From Swiss-Prot:
It is a multi-pass membrane protein. Residues 1-12, 117-138, 186-213, 265-276, 321-339, 389-402 are cytoplasmic. This is Multidrug resistance protein MdtH. Belongs to the major facilitator superfamily. DHA1 family. MdtH (TC 2.A.1.2.21) subfamily. GO terms for molecular function: transmembrane transporter activity. GO terms for cellular component: plasma membrane. InterPro entries: MFS (IPR011701), MFS_dom (IPR020846), MFS_trans_sf (IPR036259), MFS_Transporters (IPR050171), Multidrug-R_MdtH (IPR022855). It comes from the Bacteria. The chain crosses the membrane at residues 13-33, 99-116, 139-159, 165-185, 214-234, 244-264, 277-297, 300-320, 340-360, 368-388. Residues 34-98, 160-164, 235-243, 298-299, 361-367 are periplasmic. Confers resistance to norfloxacin and enoxacin. The gene is mdtH. It is found in: Cell inner membrane.
């Protein structure tokens, strides 16, 4: 085995261990934020939505800067610094009794993610061969699902005693993750050349096809982020107990562990990436529309199952498509910018979703936020279809001219 192949194999295992620590640290804390501050402390959902949206927008919206800096200086210092900053954010969240302090803790957490998320994504693109990326992204998603359940179970158990224990556990896990990276991560360069920060950012911004694709995905993320805000609140309201939230993540884990990899393997042989992304988005949109009309936990979990199945179909295709469109000369910048759709969609999804949720309750129209999200998903589906049809038409035109 060549040294390059050996490095790739070792890199796969490193990425999987690192991902598990990050997922556990995140899901111990974040699914319980809405339960803690909305249901236990009586805050308006929009106040918590602002906090979650701020974290999302800072982490993903500034991702291009984190990625560009990592292109210049390498992945290791950015990842270690970012994880320590995330740990500080979680520690601050544990003592938050005013909205401004919760917002500040989410700001710290988001800035940490800005530093470590783009270089971690770029390492996947660097270490995993193109023909293997779809399957590897599926493995990461399976791991995400298992980690989400374990994290949510642990967080729910700790929440019975004290929310500060929840946040302290998340902080400790991110400190461990920082130490793991500081000790074992080699000083790898992310790109084929050491690209200056401004040049990497400029290269991305001139790629109109990539920019349009990323911005359109904002609508997809408006739906996806509700697993952190409105779906846990809805499960808690219907069940009457916050402990039921862990079953929502258990459903995701069961579906992911049993279906994700087989669906990815089968669909990559029979369908294009864009068709898989659009099919998953359509299922997510249609399953979200009736959520506000259900009154039983069984009906709600059935719709959540459909939503997760749509995500299982769409997410590996979305990740693989984003990676395939990235320029190897500026991987960090591309993977950082690819998070901008999540920044915009996440911020609007959290803040707008929280506001619509409160509005729906006040006017006795609980289905309002869910119907709006479903409509947004349908429009995003149509916009992606138009983009992909334009791309195919341009390709056919070039082939005919040649």
């Amino acid at each position: 085995m060549s040294r390059v192949s050996q490095a790739r194999n070792l890199g796969k295992y490193f990425l999987l261990i690192d991902n598990m620590l990050v997922v556990l640290g995140f899901f111990v804390v974040f699914p319980l934020i809405s339960i803690r501050f909305v249901d236990q402390m009586g805050w308006a959902a929009v106040m918590v939505g602002i906090a979650l949206g701020l974290r999302q927008f800072i982490q993903q919206g500034l991702g291009i800067f984190g990625g560009a800096i990592a292109d210049r200086f390498g992945a290791k210092p950015m990842i270690v610094t970012g994880m320590l900053m995330r740990a500080a954010g979680f520690a601050t969240m544990g003592i938050a009794h005013e909205p401004w302090l919760l917002w500040f803790s989410c700001l710290l957490s988001g800035l940490g993610g800005t530093l470590f998320d783009p270089p971690r994504s770029a390492l996947v693109v660097k270490l995993i061969r193109p023909q293997q990326r779809g399957r590897f992204f599926s493995l990461l998603m399976m791991q995400d699902s298992a980690g989400a359940v374990i994290g949510a179970l642990l967080g729910s158990w700790l929440l019975q005693y004290d929310f500060r224990l929840v946040c302290a556990t998340g902080a400790v896990l991110f400190v461990l993750c920082a130490a793991f990276n500081a000790w074992l991560l080699p000083a790898w360069k992310l790109s084929t050349v050491r690209t200056p920060v401004r040049e990497g950012m400029t290269r991305v911004m001139r790629d109109k096809r990539f920019v349009t694709y990323v911005l359109t995905l904002a609508g997809y993320y408006m739906l996806a982020v509700q697993v952190m805000l409105m779906l846990p609140i809805m499960v808690n309201d219907v069940a009457g107990a916050p402990s039921a939230v862990k079953w929502m993540y258990a459903i995701e884990a069961c579906l992911s562990l049993t279906l994700l990899y087989p669906i990815a393997r089968w669909s990559e042989k029979h369908f294009r990436l864009e068709h898989r992304l659009m099919a998953g988005l359509l299922i997510m949109s249609l399953s979200m529309m009736p959520v506000g009309m259900v009154s039983g936990l069984q009906q709600l979990f059935t719709l959540i199952c459909l939503f997760y199945i749509g995500s299982i179909i769409a997410e590996p295709a979305r990740e693989t498509l984003s990676a395939s469109l990235a320029d190897a000369r500026a991987r960090g910048s591309y993977m950082g910018f690819s998070r901008l759709g999540l920044a915009i969609g996440g911020a609007i999804g959290y803040i707008g979703g929280g506001w619509l949720f409160d509005l729906g309750k006040s006017v006795h129209q609980p289905e309002l936020p869910w119907m709006m999200l479903g409509i947004i998903g349908i429009f995003t589906f149509l916009a992606l279809g138009w983009q992909f049809s334009q791309k195919r038409a341009a390709r056919r035109l070039l082939e005919r001219d040649a």
